[in-house]
């Protein structure tokens, strides 16, 4: 007997009113992840994944483009309010927050969660150009 074709169910996106934008700004790249309050990832984007390669990945503009892409994906969940957590010393810290604000999100608060070592690992040697 022939198998009946099963219909692929359309995945229903859950509606989330407010979430958390995690920004990881390193010296080489910027990663933007938008999660719900429980920490489940809704959308993410990187400067490298946005078409920037090499040293252009580590620019504020690349971080801005990554934030805009991530914001567009997060809008599908009906997100309105964002809490921003910034981590890292990279050049895309401020431009990412500005881009999320310009994308139409209401930013409730900004937290700097940069890990500071209590004399942990030895830092990289100074550059000689």
Curated annotation (Swiss-Prot):
Membership in a protein family: Belongs to the universal ribosomal protein uS11 family.
Q: How does this polypeptide assemble, per the annotation?
A: Part of the 30S ribosomal subunit. Interacts with proteins S7 and S18. Binds to IF-3.
- Provide the organism lineage as a comma list: Bacteria, Pseudomonadati, Pseudomonadota, Gammaproteobacteria, Vibrionales
Could you give one GO CC term from the UniProt record? ribonucleoprotein complex
Q: Which domain of life is it from?
A: Bacteria
User: What is the protein name stated in its UniProt record?
Assistant: Small ribosomal subunit protein uS11
Q: Please report a single Pfam family linked to this protein.
A: Ribosomal_S11
Q: Which gene encodes it?
A: rpsK
Keywords (alphabetical) are: Ribonucleoprotein, Ribosomal protein, RNA-binding, rRNA-binding
Report the function annotation for this chain.
Located on the platform of the 30S subunit, it bridges several disparate RNA helices of the 16S rRNA. Forms part of the Shine-Dalgarno cleft in the 70S ribosome.
Q: From the Swiss-Prot or TrEMBL record, what is one GO molecular function term?
A: rRNA binding
Organism whose genome encodes this protein:
Vibrio atlanticus (strain LGP32)
Record-linked Gene3D superfamilies: Ribosomal protein S11
Q: Which PROSITE patterns match?
A: RIBOSOMAL_S11
Q: Which residues form a coiled coil?
A: none
Give me any GO biological process, just one: translation
